[in-house]
Swiss-Prot record:
Signal as UniProt keyword: yes
Upper taxonomic lineage: Bacteria, Pseudomonadati, Pseudomonadota, Gammaproteobacteria, Pseudomonadales
Protein name: Thiol:disulfide interchange protein DsbA
Domain of life, per lineage: Bacteria
Function noted in UniProt: Involved in disulfide-bond formation. Acts by transferring its disulfide bond to other proteins.
Gene Ontology cellular-component terms listed: outer membrane-bounded periplasmic space
Species this protein is from: Pseudomonas aeruginosa (strain ATCC 15692 / DSM 22644 / CIP 104116 / JCM 14847 / LMG 12228 / 1C / PRS 101 / PAO1)
Paired cysteines (S-S): 56-59
Amino acid sequence: MRNLILTAMLAMASLFGMAAQADDYTAGKEYVELSSPVPVSQPGKIEVVELFWYGCPHCYAFEPTIVPWSEKLPADVHFVRLPALFGGIWNVHGQMFLTLESMGVEHDVHNAVFEAIHKEHKKLATPEEMADFLAGKGVDKEKFLSTYNSFAIKGQMEKAKKLAMAYQVTGVPTMVVNGKYRFDIGSAGGPEETLKLADYLIEKERAAAKK
């Protein structure tokens, strides 16, 4: 009986703690509620988008936190990486990511690209430089180059630009939940806090869908 009471008390304490944490999140402070929600790519699922740039040190530092979190998301949540395209080298790296994603190998080399830029100080600033580096990681060089320069990738680049504009993104890493809520490490208070906020907003959307 004592164990049951203790379990119940712990459960209630946990619930009160979650409620208190939820009360601490304020639209306009930790996150922004977009005035015009952006349609998600998979209707019926809660979409979580991470906007990033391979050259961003904060994005690189965020990887050890967000990767394990994203791999444990429940089936009703769809996680999407989206390159932020602010021109210049941002677009070059963004086109590389979209090419790798189209080839189905982004998961195999995503971390390697980050490390090449931030640890090995490679620029990866041209298609040829990227292709040579990626070939050493098992990516078909000719296929990469042909895909990189394809009309399909150019179309995906335009789509990514429009999404970033719709999300009103000004920096990275930035996260958007279900096309409605935008926030970043600065507004949330750190990497771990960013994912706690993401969890809260995911649950908020899940609860709203049940009403």
